[in-house]
């Protein structure tokens, strides 16, 4: 029958014992017997993966350290020690030791720390060699192993088996030589393997071997250890549980039960039994009702085996680190030796080369000395003869050198002449290239101009065709719906022309401020994307007024300036600008790419569009249009629409004009200077003619003066009963620069007072 885990039946009969592991020590701090020899100076190494918070290793030697398992000097592992097999021969009297013996044993115990003091950076594994030196501790362990082997032989004769569930299942694999609790053990198996460590069943002190033999033979050992296993599965379970005690760390701790009575000398140890411990103390099966002393010893043995296993793993890890460091040092040594050998070989090669050159020099000097010695041995006549021959050779050598120098000078002059020709040809080609580039640019401009003129001619032909079709429709009595149309081109077509002309802008700009509502030619159908919304980030005072800089999320900027004449000036980052008054009646837009200027009178549906150095277009309601050309033969073309019929007046630079329609023949007339012509709307709109290139368009909303193809001046008259100012727009036809001015209604000294709103160039 298995004993109770809480040990309730022994609370009143056993005295409390001091906990073997003190509070806070854990598996990293353990006790070991004092030795007379001094402790080793090598640092202890802590292996974090063996702590309870980490995953448990599969064996005490999880590192391939290279130390064979048959090494006698190695301490036994957990699997080879008696972990879960309690003694079947311990009697009740073994727990009645005196308190003085317990104190003597505790005094012979010291606390050893296995915390980490040095962990190398490189954790590479290496093969470790076996240790050839047998220490004193290894000798003691070997003697202990012999003693345990003798005890195991006695136990095997009893044919008993342990089914103690003192440890829980674990995934730790045992070493090569491990105890096998499956079935009964034979004496010859133990004698063949000297490293086999069966359970340490030590007979109690108050029983002799004869007494134990009599107990075993009399059959009084009626305990679970004396009965065989029920089946193979239980046998395998016991074998797995007996391999290691690391499963003690994976199970929750049972609350210790304090005995009812305590010994007076151990009252100070009672709080220590309340302290939590990371070990689960097993209660193995006993032959009869065991004393608490036996269970304490079993627990101490179990904890010592766990500490021994961790210490072996730490030693293996330290040995592996040492050997990895040795391997690194050997590699560094080999590398350094190789470098030194290469350096030595290079230096030896340099020395050999120096020796060779020195030997050659000595040979030359030796030859010269030998020649001089022979000359000195000869007579005066022979010396003079040799000197004469030497002089002749030197002269011949000199003449050859001079001829070679002359040839080289000649070649040099030829090369210089050739290089000079190349330089001249290169300069000529460079000039031709520059001239051709200029010609190409001029031709490109000419082609562009021709293309523009062709587009204008096509547009005029289309206009004339439209007039002809309308005239035919009127002659045939078919009603037309042109009276309901506003003007040509419409606002949408003008907006499209503005968008195509502004290649640099290419998008609509809005502002986050509460600016006055504006009706631009770009209709509001386009949906603004969030990155195109501009927000103010800088405000300062400029020469035209207070200006605010706006910026969107993609880096585009726009400067908005509040000007006089109750207007706003928008300057875009691509060079375009737009001015409009707060009444949304006048709008001026300039495109920086082609220097085009657009003036819109939004309340009257009138537009002025000036294309730089090409023409000026005036669009009125009812499809009445005026085209003023800068370089064409016809300086002005008037398109009239009356009662759905169209006719055209074309004025040339000689002072003559011709009227064209599809009902009457063409009429050529001369215009007297100072007269009026081109009447519209019952005479309210007309043109005052001064010269072929000097005329003024007089209309109720504005006055437009064209002066000799150099200056265009447009005076925009303010609306009655509105808080507006009369504006004057002047544009230089040749340069594209201009100015916007505010005109006062009152005259001073017969002259109108003008104030500059803003200029542009």
From Swiss-Prot:
Subcellular location: Cytoplasm, Cytoskeleton, Microtubule organizing center, Centrosome
Protein name per UniProt: Spindle assembly abnormal protein 4
Low complexity bias (residue ranges): 164-173, 479-497
Superkingdom of source: Eukaryota
Region named Disordered: 1-109, 164-228, 252-280, 479-510
Function noted in UniProt: Required for centrosome duplication. Plays a central role in determining centrosome size.
Extent of Basic and acidic residues compositional bias: 90-106, 265-280
Keyword Cytoplasm: yes
Record field: compositional bias (Polar residues): 51-62, 210-223
Principal location class: cytoplasm
Coiled-coil ranges from the UniProt annotation: 129-156, 326-464
GO cellular component, one term: centrosome
Keywords recorded for this protein, A-Z: Cell cycle, Coiled coil, Cytoplasm, Cytoskeleton, Developmental protein
Gene that produces this protein: sas-4
Residue stretches of biased makeup (Acidic residues): 1-11
């Amino acid at each position: 029958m298995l004993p109770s885990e809480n040990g309730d039946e022994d609370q009143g009969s056993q005295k409390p014992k001091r906990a073997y592991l003190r509070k806070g020590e854990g598996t990293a701090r353990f006790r070991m017997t004092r030795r007379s020899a001094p402790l080793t100076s090598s640092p202890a190494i802590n292996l974090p993966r063996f702590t309870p918070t980490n995953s448990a290793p599969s064996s005490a030697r999880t590192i391939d350290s290279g130390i064979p398992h048959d090494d006698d000097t190695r301490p036994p592992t957990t699997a080879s020690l008696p972990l879960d097999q309690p003694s079947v021969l311990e009697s009740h009297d073994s727990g009645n030791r005196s308190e003085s013996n317990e104190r003597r044993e505790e005094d012979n115990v010291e606390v050893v720390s296995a915390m980490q003091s040095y962990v190398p950076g490189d954790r590479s594994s290496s093969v470790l060699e076996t240790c050839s030196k047998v220490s004193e501790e290894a000798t003691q362990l070997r003697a202990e192993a012999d003693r345990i082997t003798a005890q195991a032989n006695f136990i095997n004769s009893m044919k008993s088996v342990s089914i103690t569930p003192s440890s829980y299942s674990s995934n730790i694999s045992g070493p090569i030589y491990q105890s096998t609790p499956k079935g009964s053990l034979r004496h010859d198996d133990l004698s063949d393997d000297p490293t086999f460590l069966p359970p340490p069943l030590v007979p109690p002190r108050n029983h002799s071997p004869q007494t134990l033999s009599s107990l075993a033979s009399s059959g009084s050992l009626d305990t679970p250890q004396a009965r065989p296993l029920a089946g193979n599965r239980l046998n395998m379970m016991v074998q797995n549980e007996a391999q290691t005690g690391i499963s003690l760390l994976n199970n929750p701790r049972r609350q210790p039960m304090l005995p009812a009575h305590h010994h007076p000398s151990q009252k100070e140890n009672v709080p220590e039994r309340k302290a939590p411990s990371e070990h689960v103390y097993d209660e193995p099966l006993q032959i009869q009702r065991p004393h608490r002393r036996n269970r304490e010893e079993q627990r101490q043995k179990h904890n010592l085996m766990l500490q021994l296993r961790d210490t072996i793993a730490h030693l293996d890890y330290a040995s592996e680190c040492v050997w990895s460091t040795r391997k690194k040092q050997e590699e560094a040594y080999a590398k350094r030796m190789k470098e030194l050998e290469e350096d030595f070989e290079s230096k030896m090669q340099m020395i050999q080369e120096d020796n060779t050159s020195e030997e050659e020099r000595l040979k030359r000097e030796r030859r010269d000395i030998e020649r001089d010695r022979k000359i000195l041995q000869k007579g005066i006549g022979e010396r003079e003869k040799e000197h004469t021959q030497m002089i002749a050779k030197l002269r011949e050598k000199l003449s050859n050198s001079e001829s070679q120098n002359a040839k080289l000078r000649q070649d040099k002059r030829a090369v210089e002449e050739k290089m000079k020709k190349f330089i001249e040809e290169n300069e000529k080609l460079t000039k031709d290239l520059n001239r051709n580039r200029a010609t190409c640019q001029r031709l490109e401009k000419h082609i562009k101009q021709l293309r523009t003129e062709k587009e204008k001619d096509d547009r005029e032909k289309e206009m004339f065709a439209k007039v002809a079709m309308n005239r035919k429709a009127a002659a045939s009595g078919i009603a037309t719906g042109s009276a309901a149309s506003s003007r040509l081109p419409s606002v949408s077509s003008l907006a499209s022309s503005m968008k195509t002309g502004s290649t640099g802008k290419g998008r609509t700009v809005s502002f986050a401020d509460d600016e006055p509502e504006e009706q631009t030619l770009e209709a509001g159908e386009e949906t603004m994307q969030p990155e195109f919304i501009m927000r103010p980030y800088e405000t300062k005072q400029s020469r035209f007024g207070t200006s605010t800089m706006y910026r969107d999320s993609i880096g585009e900027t726009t400067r908005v300036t509040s000007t006089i004449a109750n207007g706003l000036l928008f300057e875009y980052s691509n060079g375009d600008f737009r001015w409009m008054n707060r009444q949304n009646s006048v709008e001026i837009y300039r495109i920086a790419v082609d220097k085009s200027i657009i003036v819109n009178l939004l309340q009257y549906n009138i537009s002025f569009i000036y294309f730089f150095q090409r023409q000026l277009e005036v669009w009125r309601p009812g499809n009445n249009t005026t085209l003023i050309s800068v370089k064409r033969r016809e300086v002005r073309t008037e398109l009239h629409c009356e009662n759905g019929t169209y006719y055209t007046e074309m004025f040339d630079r000689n002072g003559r004009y011709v009227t064209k329609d599809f009902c009457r023949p063409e009429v050529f007339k001369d215009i007297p200077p100072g007269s009026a012509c081109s009447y519209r709307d019952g005479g309210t709109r007309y043109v005052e003619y001064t010269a072929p290139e000097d005329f003024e368009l007089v209309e109720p909303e504005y006055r437009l003066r064209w002066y000799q193809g150099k200056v265009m001046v447009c005076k925009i008259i303010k609306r009655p009963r509105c808080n507006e100012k009369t504006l004057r727009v002047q544009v230089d036809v040749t340069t594209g620069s201009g100015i916007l001015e505010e005109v006062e209604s009152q005259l001073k000294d017969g002259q109108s007072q003008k104030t500059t709103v803003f200029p542009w160039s």
